[in-house]
């Protein structure tokens, strides 16, 4: 089944107990408006018309590389959304994907060297979870990141925290080749610590970038020790 807005609504209602249809659709709508530059709730599948991967990586495989993170630059005023597909202009890519090393300011340097939009407010840092739509639609982590951002921009901060915790809990089941719950605490704590520290660092920045970069989860694909 294609990954649609309703799919996200259904999953939000599982992840956030008690959230209503209207609330969930509101989160999805805000996420889509930010991600697509669209004012409409889109219930049809999202399809990628073309995406350029700077280092040639395919999100459907090899999504996790040890000590690497995924960053995505988002929309700007010249981006276009047509029907069910995202379209790109040659000099203003709607979405730009690359891997980088997670140092304190690597995202800043990556943005400077990117061929995509120079608008700092269009960039979002996403740490990948290998939970990709098998039907070829939008990578779920991109949508989750946008929904997470929508949650943080509303007054439902407690919902955002629940959503964050739910993603963290889900991710540990996805990232270990031979998952063993009894051995996963170290990796879960490491990811949670990194997430909190990164959010704290971004919140303290004075250049206006912090509020526009919403980290989610970071793991390395290693067998739990």
Regions found by a protein language model. Give the residues of each.
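Glycine-enriched, solvent-exposed interface loops adjoining structured elements
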Residues: 1-225
């Amino acid at each position: 089944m294609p990954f649609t807005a309703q799919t996200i609504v259904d999953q939000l209602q599982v992840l956030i107990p008690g959230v209503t249809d209207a609330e969930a659709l509101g989160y999805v709508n805000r996420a889509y408006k930010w991600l697509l530059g669209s004012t409409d709730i889109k219930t049809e599948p999202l399809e990628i018309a073309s995406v350029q991967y700077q280092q040639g990586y395919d999100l459907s495989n090899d999504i996790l590389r040890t000590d690497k993170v995924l960053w995505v630059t988002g929309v700007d005023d010249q981006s276009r959304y047509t029907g069910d597909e995202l379209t790109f202009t040659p000099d203003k890519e709607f979405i730009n994907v690359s891997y980088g090393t997670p140092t304190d300011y690597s995202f800043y340097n990556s943005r400077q060297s990117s061929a995509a939009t120079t608008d700092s407010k269009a960039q979002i840092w996403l740490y990948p979870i290998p939970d990709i739509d098998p039907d070829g639609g939008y990578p779920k982590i991109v949508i989750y990141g946008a929904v997470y951002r929508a949650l943080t921009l509303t007054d439902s901060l407690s919902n955002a925290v629940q959503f964050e915790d739910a993603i963290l809990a889900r991710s540990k089941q996805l990232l270990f080749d031979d998952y063993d719950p009894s051995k996963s605490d170290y990796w879960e704590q490491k990811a949670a610590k990194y997430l909190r520290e990164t959010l704290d660092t971004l919140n303290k920045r004075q250049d206006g970038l912090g509020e526009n970069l919403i980290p989610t989860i970071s793991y390395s694909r290693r067998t739990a020790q």
